[in-house]
């Protein structure tokens, strides 16, 4: 992450742009077409282990530095994938694993603090990818939320790229959030929500097979 939190203290847009260009050159040399960067989470709880990966606690600063990272990456032909969308950086007690429950953030705070850097990423910098987060909001997992992945992201922000899940975020809809009874219904929920790519290396039984069953059962239409 190139000492992300330290870089925010300098607020050096040119430096971030240069970091992005070097990152893109190295990624291109390896044959990559996209990269899961930048992290646009807002640092709020110092107990959270990923605070060091954030640009800071100010949405303006995070948005401005994030824009430079995105433009630097995409100028070199690499697709930027900002993460983690959305309201991810305030887990209960600062713990990152089994506490991915509703962060209890008011709508106004969500908009002006946690979503603002992402708005800039899509509307100002033209990011072509985004990663959905593990947590839920108001009881609905973000990775299965039509409100976040379609209404806000595509209809409001005008996002035209792909939505990729964080690792196992799809499975967590059943195993952690427990809002669906089986993987077939999970597959239907995430597809209807607006997810395009699932991130995880696992057997077909974990997603491909349930997805086929959901389509055969009419839970996912051809139009979707």
Q: Which ranges hold each PLM region?
A:
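Glycoside hydrolase catalytic-domain context in secreted enzymes
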Residues: 1-224
């Amino acid at each position: 992450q190139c000492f992300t939190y330290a870089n925010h203290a300098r607020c050096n847009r040119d430096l971030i742009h240069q970091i992005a260009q070097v990152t893109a050159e190295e990624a291109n040399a390896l044959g990559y077409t996209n990269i899961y960067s930048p992290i646009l989470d807002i640092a709020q709880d110092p107990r959270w282990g990923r605070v060091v990966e954030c640009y800071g606690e100010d949405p303006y600063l995070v948005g401005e530095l994030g824009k430079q990272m995105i433009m630097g990456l995409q100028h070199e032909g690499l697709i930027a994938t900002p993460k983690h969308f959305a309201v991810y950086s305030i887990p209960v007690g600062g713990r990152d694993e089994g506490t991915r429950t509703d962060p209890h953030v008011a709508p106004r705070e969500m908009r002006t603090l946690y979503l603002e850097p992402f708005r800039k990423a899509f509307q100002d910098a033209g990011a072509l990818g985004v990663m959905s987060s593990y947590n839920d909001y108001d009881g609905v997992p973000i990775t299965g939320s039509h409100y976040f992945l379609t209404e806000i992201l595509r209809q409001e922000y005008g996002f035209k790229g792909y939505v990729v899940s964080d690792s196992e975020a799809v499975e967590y809809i059943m195993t952690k959030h427990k809002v669906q009874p089986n993987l077939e219904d999970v597959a239907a929920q995430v597809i209807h929500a607006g997810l395009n790519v699932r991130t995880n290396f696992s057997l077909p039984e974990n997603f491909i097979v349930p997805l086929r069953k959901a389509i055969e059962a009419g839970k996912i239409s051809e139009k979707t």
